Amino acid sequence: MSNSTLKVKTKSMPDSRLAVELEISAKQCKESYQQALSKLSKTANLPGFRKGKVPQAVLLQQVGAKRIQASAIEKLLEVVWPQALQQESIEPLCEPELIGGFEALLENFNPDSKLTLTLETDISPIPQLKSSKGLTVEAEKVVFDPKKIDELIEQSRKQLSTLIPVENRPAKKGDVAVVSFEGKFTDNNSPIEGGNSDSMDIELEKGQMIPGFVEGIIGMNINDEKTVECTFPKDYPQEDARNRKAKFDIKVKDLKTRELPKLDDDFAKQASDKDSLEELRKELEAKLKEDAHQRSIKNRQEALLKALVEQLEIDLPKTLIEIETRNLIEQTARNFAQQGIDVKSTFTPELINKLMDSSRPEAIENLRRQFAMQALRKEEGIEVPNKEVDKKFEEVKKELSKEKNIDFEKLKEAVLEDLLQDKVFTWLEENNTVIETLPKTKSLNGKPSTQGKTSQSKSKKTKTKVEKTTK
């Protein structure tokens, strides 16, 4: 088939969709038709004729012109679409859609006449930023809380504690109860999936089970039996259980309490590589301060990126939204698999359809963030020198030296992406204003109040001042 220049017209559509109108010459149509007819005549088996020797007139009569025309059109589409993409430098994101449908095109096809058809496809959107400088945002400053040191130490004491039997008293908060239970939904008395056990150790602390379960056990003695009424939370993972009332027949089989180790240097040696409790506290303080610092940085970055995304103008194509949505669902499935959940039985077609709808807003937000950063990098020429990438790549490789099955090509791409992101956030910090607000606290009159710090840096200048703000 000849590969003459196509007549191509393009028209931009909503959602970054492109309509491509193609005018195929009568010569190409005739060639495609003749080739389809010739190919079929060589393979057709008709009574009274040898294979490949069927006259074309007989073939048309027996097979029908429409079948040959359909083959001719299919071949034309295989040829002219890639030709149009190359000719017009179009990079499609998906397979094209034939506007009007194949049947309508077949009805209008005449091998002796030119053929005009329209194909639509999604293309990459063009992101534009209305502004990227002089923005003012608020971000919560994470403050180091000395109480966290004691909380971490208590957690460690709990982990190193010894469980000892409880005698002559009922269960109380902080105990560990060994219970058997069977649960049913109150509305139809049906058993709850996973709602029973012959023996389970339960920490009698808030948040360990659904609301009401632990509270129902507190006050029971060993061998006591009791029916406890509970209500499943509205955000419970098992969808059919959300907001439903349930009753659990519970029996306390055993009761234990924790004997905590003494808070001394011996405990510090057991809980860490430090020789004294004072050294342990200093180490925890340093880690908590660094954690607060990093979380503050993260809050600043998130606030700046959110403001940048608000300045983004983009027409996202449905193809990209669907791909990102599926990526989110696949990530959820991987997380479930890591928890030992049977993904195949859990992710039914019905659930996947629901997740496609519920995950769509997050997918759109993810794409907007990606394109906002991409647009800023392009506008401001933000790049990472190869030497810097190579240096960081070698550092990461060294850290992962004991890991197996590493895709180093993907690893290097991830390193580059991280470095680019760091440079984008550095640029945003230097060219915009971040007001850091402290967490809300109770003032003397009992009303919530906040204090804030404004830090602004542009280029190499840094300006910092402290001011009070009230939200």
Swiss-Prot record:
Keywords: Cell cycle, Cell division, Chaperone, Cytoplasm, Isomerase, Rotamase. It is found in: Cytoplasm. It is an enzyme of class 5 (isomerase). The keyword Plastid does not apply. Residues 436-471 are annotated as: Disordered. Consists of 3 domains; the N-terminus binds the ribosome, the middle domain has PPIase activity, while the C-terminus has intrinsic chaperone activity on its own. PANTHER family: TRIGGER FACTOR CHAPERONE AND PEPTIDYL-PROLYL CIS/TRANS ISOMERASE (PTHR30560), TRIGGER FACTOR-LIKE PROTEIN TIG, CHLOROPLASTIC (PTHR30560:SF3). This is Trigger factor.
